[in-house]
Every structure is written in C-alpha cells, then in structure tokens.
C-alpha cells in the first residue's frame, strides 16, 4: 500500500485469519437473524412512524404461564405455521384482565424454534400508519407479529376503519411475513 495510507491502515482493526466466516455461514446467520436492528433485537415499538427496539422485552417464560393451555397452544401453533411459511389467520385474543393475553404473545419470543420471529407493539394511535409499517416489513425473511394491546373503539373512532381495512384487505396484498 502507498505510504500515505499508513496512518489509516494503522487504525484499522486487525482481524484474525484463523477462523474466517464462510459465505455459507454468513448467509445462514443473516437468513436466521436478519440484519441491522432486526439482527440485534426481537421486540420493537412502532412509535411516530419509526421502529424503536426494546432493549429488554418483558417476555414471561413457560414456567410463568399458568392456565389457558388450549388457547396458548393455538396461538403457538398458528405462529409456528407462519414461521414455516404457511398462510395463517390474524388472531384476536379477548378476555378478562389478567388472563394472560399479552403474556401469551410476548412468551412466543422465548420459545425454541421461534428465533426468526419479531414482535412489534403498535399503539392504537399508530393504527392509521400501519400500512406503512407493513410495507417496511414486507419482503424480509423474518416473520413479524404486530401486537396491539388493550384495543377498544368508540362509536365514531376513525382508527377502527383503518384497522378494518388492513384486516379485511385492501388494494395491497398482505405480505407473507
């Protein structure tokens, strides 16, 4: 290298050549984990039109999940089918407060074999911007659950029609992920 590159080269990291990654290993890593924020984080908040990573998500373990096994197993089976590339239905969990609806969804991030799953929490105020989020996520190999907690609508609520259009389908095709 030319001498003028000396100061620059001196500050570059020194990589050990003893265990290089093969192209196949790198490909498999990015296929399984995504890239950028999706490689480093599994839970996100959709806030003001941006994905914000959740550094320490509150994901209860299996030992904390008591009762409602039938319902939880259906959610797990539906999510597993999505991760396997099958078409799946949207899921609506309803019930009394404290019955584990939110915990059931958050627990999915702790399950073995669900490493390609990412969870994105969307507040009711962000529903109108949901098509933009869906376009952002479309085409990626990872699978996403859009999690809307404590959803309630007033009679004249405009966010209801935005969600209804997304759930029932509009002109844009729903991405497979």
How would you name each of these model-derived features?
Residues 111-144, 150-156:
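AAA+/P-loop NTPase substrate/partner-engagement loops
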Residues 85-105:
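Walker A/P-loop nucleotide-binding motif
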Residues 57-91:
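Pre-Walker A (pre-P-loop) alpha-helix and adjacent loop at the N terminus of AAA/AAA+ ATPase modules
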Residues 106-110:
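A conserved segment at the C-terminal end of the G1
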Residues 1-70:
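AAA+ P-loop ATPase mechanoenzymes
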